[in-house]
UniProtKB/Swiss-Prot annotation:
Disruption phenotype: Deficient DNA double-strand break formation during meiotic recombination. It is found in: Chromosome. The keyword DNA repair does not apply. Belongs to the MEI4L family. This is Meiosis-specific protein MEI4. It comes from Mus musculus. One of its GO terms (cellular component) is lateral element. Required for DNA double-strand breaks (DSBs) formation in unsynapsed regions during meiotic recombination. Probably acts by forming a complex with IHO1 and REC114, which activates DSBs formation in unsynapsed regions, an essential step to ensure completion of synapsis.
Amino acid sequence: MDIQPWYLKTSKLALALAIIHSKPADRSSREYTEYLASLVTQKESTWKSKLEALEAEVLQLRQKLLLSRISSGLFKNGPDVLPTLSDQEPTSSENTLTLMDDSGCVLSNEQRNEPAELSQHFVESTDPPLLPLPLEKRPRTTLENPLSSHMQFFQHLLELKKWTESSSLKVYLTHFEKDSSTVSDSVSQLLDALITFYRNPKLPFSSFWTEAVGTLARLASDFNLSNHIFKRCSKKLEEFEKTLLQAILENNSINRFQVQRYVSQSLVTLGSCSLLRKSIISLLLSEVNSFVDDLGAIDQDQGIYDVTRYENIFSLFWILEQVLQQAPQGDRTAHMDHSIPEMQTFLQKHDEVIFRLSDAFPLFAFYLWRLGVLLNSAEMETVKNESLP
């Protein structure tokens, strides 16, 4: 007889007898068991909250320690090497993006920001302000507040790295190699919060979240950082990319275009990094190819198509156009990778699809044509650059 199952059965029997003997007279055994279970659940929830708070404190201490080690290494090389950090902090939830002030229905050219202008403005403001050391504790009243310390940490880290590189110092890499887990754990928590928010983004859209995505993009654009961090967080990063995509495609609210604009810009920001560029393009083209197949089948059978999905797919076209037209950060010499299966599939059936859908869906066919032109141009540019001596 196996001892483990026997001990388990004996323990269950002993627990049942103890509950029966200790239950109050005015309660049944079942009621008393449910009462005890609720007490245990409450205690577990309390202890879990305390554990999460302690883990957050430990991570914050690890962040301070890493920054202090890097700073002390810089100081040994001379006080003039140390960077001066400003006293500003990441944008709070009270400071929301100004584009959210309108209803999304204003058509005036004076009040309307074109996507290109929005993209240019965002790229120019992706370097968020830095905070003084040490990292400060903030009241944890909202989802944003616990992340403020991570944002401060990443901003300090990137600034210190910039100074070590400009000073030709190896202090940064020495300490980072020994404790890269601190950064990867911080990135993991930042991704968790971003995934939670973007699963159900609501208005007004806080600029904190766009700054968080911008910081993530800066980390991904740095070769030394991304080489250590994102191989540990690759699955979570992939989940975040898919969450952003679903936030666009599955949104069926009347005022969804405002939210889609900012979610789309987040994908453009991620797609500007050479490390994430391929996965973003692959993800978007996969969805476009799938919709093309569905639309072709509907057109052939004279069926009814999902109007909301049809409208939402145009955001994907805009994202792809923006990503394809800008040079990737972190590797300016990088070219388009035409080995992406989704890209090959798109280009192979490009002309046929346009011819077949141009009568029933002329606008959709026009955007397909534009996207095809960009992809073919990128391919020709890549071949040209590779053929040069």
